[in-house]
Regions:
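Vicinal oxygen chelate
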Residues: 1-5, 26-77, 83-113
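Helix N-cap motif at beta-to-alpha junctions
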Residues: 12-13, 79-81
Length: 117
């Protein structure tokens, strides 16, 4: 296997693209297409955003097949945890989980929902 690309369905690619750029502290750019955008850093793909219902991908046909966020967790390992936390707090009204140390990994983490849930 060469590389894993995580693709998530979103309602508005441009809005979600800007939201994830803000969260991850990436420089602002525009997605390449209205229906698809790839977030990259240092030559690595971090996340692909795909508009629901485009390109006939069965798992991305409709968000109505499952509740938003059901079965999907995205963990981003960052070098700037405190800065990422500060950015996250500007993007949501409240975190889903406040910062804490994960007992399994021994790393600090917090949880929030993106614009699509």
């Amino acid at each position: 296997m060469k590389r894993l690309w995580t693709i998530i369905g979103v309602n508005d690619v441009a809005r979600s693209f800007a939201w994830y750029q803000s969260l991850l502290g990436l420089p602002p750019t525009q997605p390449a297409h209205d229906c698809f955008g790839v977030l990259e850093a240092d030559g690595a793909v971090l996340l692909c955003l795909h508009r629901w219902g485009d390109h006939e991908h069965p798992p991305l046909a409709s968000p109505a097949r499952a509740a938003p966020g059901n079965g999907l967790l995205l963990f981003f390992r960052v070098d700037d945890f405190d800065d990422a936390l500060a950015r996250a707090r500007t993007l949501v009204d409240a975190l889903e989980e406040e910062p804490h140390v994960n007992p399994g990994t021994g790393t600090r983490e917090f949880a929030l929902r993106d614009p699509d849930g």
